[in-house]
């Protein structure tokens, strides 16, 4: 495993674009901390995100994993480019000539996906922990380390999304077309929502949409805003229901794990049958 990872990181670190995107990704993740500095002073209105409970434990685990997931496209570009470069630079063929099997080749890419996901999860854990210890009103260990399941959901969401990008990179060969296909698939799931939710049956959509790849990954971390006490108070005043189930159910984990298996095995099958 370490040998395969070393091969991939040598390739990535010698690619200036990949290096820039990886560094930019972690810089953007660290900028989440700057949210704590946002203060609005407008006449008699004094508003601070930190004072509104944004960084209270255990809510911060939910909020930061939700926000950080939006930046995953940076690493997605790296992963798609990583695969397309293997074809354009003919390093894939050279690796196979040098004795690397096709199975080991796909595993090296999957290990890279796992390492990116693990590093990102650890980074978000540390950033959230520091922000929480500084701003949270609750510092009891039992509260601090509750709701850590959001970190696992975040990790699995990244692995699923990056595995999808890897599959598209193997399938399409060109990074621009692979990213274009990713955007088209997102549009398809949006159209699926509009047709089935509004035109056919909301109940049918709720059942079937759980199995769509991007939607299933999105379901791992629901929106966190309605958990804020200010939002709940406002909702109760207008008679709206603000009590939602924010946690991930076991079957939602299983669905994403199934897609990860499909994407990685599919990548291997395509590579095995393709004439290089």
Residue map of PLM features:
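Aromatic- and glycine-rich beta-strand/loop motifs that create alpha-glucan
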Residues: 1-26
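Residues that define the loop-to-transmembrane-helix transition and helix capping
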Residues: 16-19, 103, 176
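Central hydrophobic cores of alpha-helical transmembrane segments
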Residues: 21-26, 178-189, 206-211
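Secretory targeting signals
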Residues: 24-82, 107-173, 197-200, 212, ...
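Hydrophobic transmembrane alpha-helices of multi-pass small-molecule transporters
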Residues: 33, 117, 190-191, 264
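Transmembrane helix boundary and interhelical loop/hinge segments in multi-pass membrane proteins
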Residues: 77-103, 110
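Junction motif at the cytosolic side of a transmembrane helix
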Residues: 254-276
